[in-house]
């Protein structure tokens, strides 16, 4: 019998660096709304909730530089800096707020 457990993940020792070779942009974001806004790790930041005030043009094709499956919560009235990285792979964005629905390269 084997000691392996189906689906088990055995990580390497040490720290795993995320988005190591990606260009990082820091953007200041303010929540002008009266409710918290949460943005997930792979959400096209350009299309985030309109209550979030930031320079949208520079965030086109970018997502949060945080681990997959996590999110950042913006409380009403708060201002914070976030780090963004470019989408990789095919660089297609569908859904979200339907502002792109296609290639991020065009």
Curated annotation (Swiss-Prot):
The first-level EC class reads: hydrolase
What are the alphabetically sorted keywords of the record? Cytoplasm, Hydrolase
* Catalytic function, reaction form: urea + 2 H2O + H(+) = hydrogencarbonate + 2 NH4(+)
* GO CC field: urease complex
Q: Which GO terms describe its molecular function?
A: urease activity
Localization, per the record, is: Cytoplasm
Q: Which domain of life is it from?
A: Bacteria
EC numbers, comma separated: 3.5.1.5
The record ties this protein, via SUPFAM superfamilies, to: Urease, beta-subunit
Task: Kindly give the NCBIfam families that the UniProt entry links to this protein.
Answer: PRK13203.1 (NF009682), urease_beta (TIGR00192)
Family recorded in the similarity comment: Belongs to the urease beta subunit family.
Tell me the subunit arrangement. Heterotrimer of UreA (gamma), UreB (beta) and UreC (alpha) subunits. Three heterotrimers associate to form the active enzyme.
| Name assigned to this protein | Urease subunit beta
